[in-house]
């Protein structure tokens, strides 16, 4: 049996009856295995005129006849042609019907969790509120994945597509951000868990960056806001910069200052004296029970409790005055007079004075005659030197130019002078 498949396009069906019959006959003749039965079916189509439709039900032979039905044999032939047409597009028809059925079912049985993949703000807010109220969806804090609260919860087709898109987007974002940032899960940081060596390395790198940032922030703190130890070291350096001869440098450390000053102890300040002489508030109770070593302060503490013995008074000038009233005073030496210089000193002192060169006498500032300073004169008082007057060329006396002499006269004069020299040697 030969299967006939003809593409019935609108352009093909719009032809006349005679033209349609001719084209069908040509098509049947081109078949490798011609069939006589098929030829009879095609030739029978030329007998009837299909006015209503191309292959319509109402077939009329003559214009006067009304409603004449075709024979069963012709209807069977028409069904065969339609089946041959449908077999060619069976897959396309089934695919279209399945898509229509799926879309129809989606409109009726919508998704349980409401994920429609839209990026609208209201839709996302509605989805989040709905999932939060009913408890259908939640995120695991450990795996960071979406989980279902109920075991019997079903996931629709849209949920699968949305979840797949979300995973792909998340993987792309991780690959993109891996070179820029290092993200560490919060539960790993709190519990101290490290799943892999890669996460451990990332965590150590993040800690190093955090410490470096803290150090940078500490360097930014002004000197007035730093620890009191640093301020105390600076005060010590400021107090000893004159005595030790060191230049004042505010960042001079305690160890360097101690080495440069020759290990001199710093002067006790008010704060240190208070902490040394009295008990600190942070002193534990065990230290209070044990006896403390003897110190200089013990005598000071005992003084208010017991009366002090009478101490001998220091010697004063009045004691000598009392003794002088009862004892006669010795003869006091005479004051120096002018006659002492007249007495001749011994010979040794005279020789020593002769050997010493006389010292130059120093003049006082008021005794030295200062050279008088030159008195400043005004510009109008100074006698200006007369400037030479410029003479014009016509007024200037022109000097007489020397006359030019001929060469012959000069030679004769020279010769006469030479002969005169020879004659009168």
Curated annotation (Swiss-Prot):
InterPro entries, A to Z: NPIP, NPIP_N
Region listing for Disordered, in residue ranges: 332-414
Composition bias type Basic and acidic residues, residue spans: 353-395
Basic residues: bias regions: 401-414
Family: Belongs to the NPIP family.
Protein name: Nuclear pore complex-interacting protein family member B6
Gene for this chain: NPIPB6
